[in-house]
């Protein structure tokens, strides 16, 4: 049932709350860290906690239902239409990453969704699309470059990053590590000559 890094308990726990999962936080982390998509809260929008999403309509039974009510607001829908399918695909994993098929109240977990027009049953069905999307972009190169050099890329690094990404070509992580550590930016920095 576990499918790669996204289903490891450490990732799932860090992107959850202590008392419940947070599909929004999980999806935000995936988009920011694997796709380099910066997400910021919308301005001038009062964002209620999911526990408050039931309002006058009665109690919310599970996270999916809470997000559906939350997404009913036009101010929230534009981001949540993107975030929720990704985050809800991980609902089979509780706040500490243990696999589950039902919520504490007994409702069955529904981890289905649609991502970029393709339906999936759970994270296992979504991972191939996410991996393909991440590999086709420059984000993995940029993230590893930042980690290896212990700094965010500057304007001067854009050409280097483009070259690294092109040479990597969406190959394996080992291939990407090799491209970064053999780059002039990394090798010269290690000798104290690069920024």
Task: Indicate residue ranges for each PLM-predicted region.
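Active-site substrate-binding loop specific to GH73 endo-beta-N-acetylglucosaminidase modules
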Residues: 1-148, 158-173, 178-195
């Amino acid at each position: 049932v576990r499918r790669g890094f996204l289903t490891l308990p450490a990732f799932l726990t860090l992107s959850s709350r202590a008392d419940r999962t947070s599909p929004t936080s999980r999806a935000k982390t995936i988009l920011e860290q694997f796709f380099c998509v910066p997400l910021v809260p919308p301005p001038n929008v009062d964002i209620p906690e999911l526990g408050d999403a039931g309002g006058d309509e009665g109690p919310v039974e599970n996270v999916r239902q809470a997000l559906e009510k939350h997404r009913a607001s036009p101010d929230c829908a534009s981001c949540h239409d993107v975030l929720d399918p990704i985050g809800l695909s991980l609902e089979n994993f509780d706040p500490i990453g243990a696999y589950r098929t039902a919520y504490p109240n007994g409702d069955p977990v529904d981890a289905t969704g649609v991502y970029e027009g393709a339906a999936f049953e759970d994270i296992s069905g979504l991972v191939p699309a996410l991996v393909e999307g991440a590999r086709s972009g420059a984000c993995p190169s940029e993230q590893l470059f930042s980690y290896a050099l212990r700094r965010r890329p500057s304007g001067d690094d854009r050409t280097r990053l483009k070259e690294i990404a092109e040479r990597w070509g969406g190959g394996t992580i080992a291939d990407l590590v090799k491209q970064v550590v053999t780059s002039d930016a990394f090798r010269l920095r290690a000798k104290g000559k690069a920024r």
